[in-house]
């Protein structure tokens, strides 16, 4: 569409003035924006990366992961840290719950010697630390565990039983306004872990809500609802959890997808089990009876032995992972891998200010 010559000159002058005053790149045509292709970090789960559409969690954005107790929230974030560290990225863990287990983190592949960790006294201190790390431009991934544990200073200094209506919500709202722009400029991923509460007096719809007010819901580019849906057993011994993650909000790809995977105790996400299942589903791995074969070579009798083969041959696992990602990401076939989530399952869609 042609623009009037006088308007073009006026626009060019205005753009020149803006760039002179605020710096080059402060305004541009959208097609010229080099940051349109979103950089991502793997979640540690192939099926969840596919459900997210972009191949993982987006850098420069805010992400919220919420769910019931012992559902795998912290485990999932530690897997994200391990994946980021494998790409030589700097990570920080803001442990507001004072419950991070370094031994468990190390078992999941986290390099604890190079993981920055803070155990703040107040919510304001935790969020200020987040902002300082972000503005440094040197930290790539920040985890806050958890929003519910970000206690305002006034509440800590007050008496038990005092009313502090909306304090946490106001604190989070102010922090989101300040952090969002800094995260984008620094290309830092900020993940908030959140807990679930029940709304009183709800007769219809979902009574669940998350803590910390509504601001986090609006500013988050991705919201993940994680639930434990069953147990993984070896004989009578429970060795892990069957886990389902629903993508209830997604600003970088299609939302309302879900993924299921196993979290093994002491090991984390069973990525090799995912590779076997997805490989069979998409005909990269052949299954004849109980035998699994890859590229015409038998890799094991039974899923457990096939997983052991992939563990002993990481180059084969990496090759299979690459083939599946190339095949499924950004494709209709990939979208069919995960199912849509009903809108009523958006869960924790509203927050009460008092939480």
From Swiss-Prot:
ATP binds at residues 67-74. GO terms for biological process: DNA recombination; DNA repair; SOS response. Its main location: cytoplasm. The keyword Transmembrane does not apply. GO terms for cellular component: cytosol. Signal peptide: none annotated. It is found in: Cytoplasm. Residues 341-355 have a biased composition (Acidic residues). Belongs to the RecA family. HAMAP family: RecA (MF_00268). Can catalyze the hydrolysis of ATP in the presence of single-stranded DNA, the ATP-dependent uptake of single-stranded DNA by duplex DNA, and the ATP-dependent hybridization of homologous single-stranded DNAs. It interacts with LexA causing its activation and leading to its autocatalytic cleavage. This is Protein RecA.
């Amino acid at each position: 569409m042609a623009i009037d010559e006088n308007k073009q000159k006026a626009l060019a002058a205005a753009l020149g003035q803006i760039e002179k005053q605020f710096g080059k790149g402060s305004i541009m045509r959208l097609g010229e924006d080099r940051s349109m292709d979103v950089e991502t970090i793997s979640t540690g789960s192939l099926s969840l990366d596919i459900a997210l559409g972009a191949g993982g969690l987006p850098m420069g954005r805010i992400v919220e992961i919420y769910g019931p107790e012992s559902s795998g929230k912290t485990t999932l974030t530690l897997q994200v840290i391990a994946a980021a560290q494998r790409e030589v990225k700097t990570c920080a863990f803001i442990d507001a719950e004072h419950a991070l287990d370094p031994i468990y983190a190390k078992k999941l592949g986290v390099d604890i010697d190079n993981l920055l960790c803070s155990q703040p006294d107040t919510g304001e201190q935790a969020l200020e630390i987040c902002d300082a790390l972000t503005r440094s431009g040197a930290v790539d991934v920040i985890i806050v565990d958890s929003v519910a544990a970000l206690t305002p200073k006034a509440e800590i200094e007050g008496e038990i039983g005092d009313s502090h209506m909306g304090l946490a919500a106001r604190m989070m709202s102010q922090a989101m306004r300040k952090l969002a722009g800094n995260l984008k400029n620094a290309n830092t991923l900020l993940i908030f872990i959140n807990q679930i509460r029940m709304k009183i007096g709800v007769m219809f719809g979902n009574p669940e809500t998350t803590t910390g007010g509504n601001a986090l819901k609006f500013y988050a580019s991705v919201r993940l609802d994680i639930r434990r849906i069953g147990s993984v057993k070896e004989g009578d011994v429970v060795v892990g959890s069957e886990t389902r993650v629903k993508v209830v909000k997604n600003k970088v790809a299609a939302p309302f997808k879900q993924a299921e995977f196993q979290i093994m105790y002491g090991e984390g996400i069973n990525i090799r089990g995912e590779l076997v299942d997805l490989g069979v589903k998409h005909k990269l791995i052949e299954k004849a009876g109980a035998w699994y074969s890859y590229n015409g070579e038998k890799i094991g009798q039974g899923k457990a032995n096939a997983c052991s083969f992939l563990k002993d041959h990481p180059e084969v696992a990496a090759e299979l992972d690459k083939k599946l990602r190339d095949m499924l990401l950004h494709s209709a076939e990939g979208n069919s891998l995960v199912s849509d989530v009903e809108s009523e399952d958006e869960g924790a869609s509203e927050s009460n200010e008092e939480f």
